[in-house]
Amino acid sequence: MSATDRYSHQLLYATVRQRLLDDIAQGVYQAGQQIPTENELCTQYNVSRITIRKAISDLVADGVLIRWQGKGTFVQSQKVENALLTVSGFTDFGVSQGKATKEKVIEQERISAAPFCEKLNIPGNSEVFHLCRVMYLDKEPLFIDSSWIPLSRYPDFDEIYVEGSSTYQLFQERFDTRVVSDKKTIDIFAATRPQAKWLKCELGEPLFRISKIAFDQNDKPVHVSELFCRANRITLTIDNKRH
């Protein structure tokens, strides 16, 4: 390939890359949406497959696009920074970010407190309310939240709660309980089939699993929970200061 040909190819590649970026910015291809195939883009932009492939590979490397084997190439959802590290509830977090929040309850039931009695400091023969929800930010599933709430401490919470309610507001308004701190443990977990369905991800895709114990103003456990979030949907930043 001559120097002139290489220069021409670079110009074409840069033009295609920019046009794809412009289409994404203008909403032609939205977050989570599949872009056209390489053949379709070749026809659309009247360029070679090599040029299209290089432009797409570059945008994948930049985190703008994501390839799903056997499915195609999709627009990457924008990452949310520290959404799961905040002590405030999810509703408050959405307000602080100027984004709309929504939830979908996928499981709710009374179960034995035995597996959680030590963490919640409650009798093993009591019950907890298990609430499992998919939490959405601007209509995109952000994480799955499974919470276990002690009914011995918060009687009839399962009857008071309705889908869409802020659990932290209910704690404060009905039980004079404010969640002021929590203890979190973070690890990586492979997405199960149900999790992949709700989070719109691949089976086995890496998820952040955040296990949490929330505490009230009197340092008593309020609830325990597990949150599962796609690792490519969130950035966790941890600041440490030496005193």
UniProtKB/Swiss-Prot annotation:
<comment type="function">
    <text>May regulate the transcription of the frlABCDR operon, involved in the utilization of fructoselysine and psicoselysine.</text>
</comment>
<dbReference type="GO" id="GO:0003700">
    <property type="term" value="F:DNA-binding transcription factor activity"/>
</dbReference>
<dbReference type="GO" id="GO:0045892">
    <property type="term" value="P:negative regulation of DNA-templated transcription"/>
</dbReference>
<feature type="domain" description="HTH gntR-type">
    <location>
        <begin position="10"/>
        <end position="78"/>
    </location>
</feature>
<dbReference type="InterPro" id="IPR028978">
    <property type="entry name" value="Chorismate_lyase_/UTRA_dom_sf"/>
</dbReference>
<dbReference type="Pfam" id="PF00392">
    <property type="entry name" value="GntR"/>
</dbReference>
<dbReference type="InterPro" id="IPR011663">
    <property type="entry name" value="UTRA"/>
</dbReference>
<dbReference type="InterPro" id="IPR050679">
    <property type="entry name" value="Bact_HTH_transcr_reg"/>
</dbReference>
<feature type="DNA-binding region" description="H-T-H motif">
    <location>
        <begin position="38"/>
        <end position="57"/>
    </location>
</feature>
<keyword id="KW-0804">Transcription</keyword>
<comment type="pathway">
    <text>Carbohydrate metabolism; fructoselysine degradation [regulation].</text>
</comment>
<keyword id="KW-0678">Repressor</keyword>
<keyword id="KW-0805">Transcription regulation</keyword>
<dbReference type="Pfam" id="PF07702">
    <property type="entry name" value="UTRA"/>
</dbReference>
<dbReference type="InterPro" id="IPR036390">
    <property type="entry name" value="WH_DNA-bd_sf"/>
</dbReference>
<keyword id="KW-0238">DNA-binding</keyword>
<dbReference type="InterPro" id="IPR036388">
    <property type="entry name" value="WH-like_DNA-bd_sf"/>
</dbReference>
<dbReference type="GO" id="GO:0003677">
    <property type="term" value="F:DNA binding"/>
</dbReference>
<protein>
    <recommendedName>
        <fullName>Probable fructoselysine utilization operon transcriptional repressor</fullName>
    </recommendedName>
</protein>
<dbReference type="InterPro" id="IPR000524">
    <property type="entry name" value="Tscrpt_reg_HTH_GntR"/>
</dbReference>
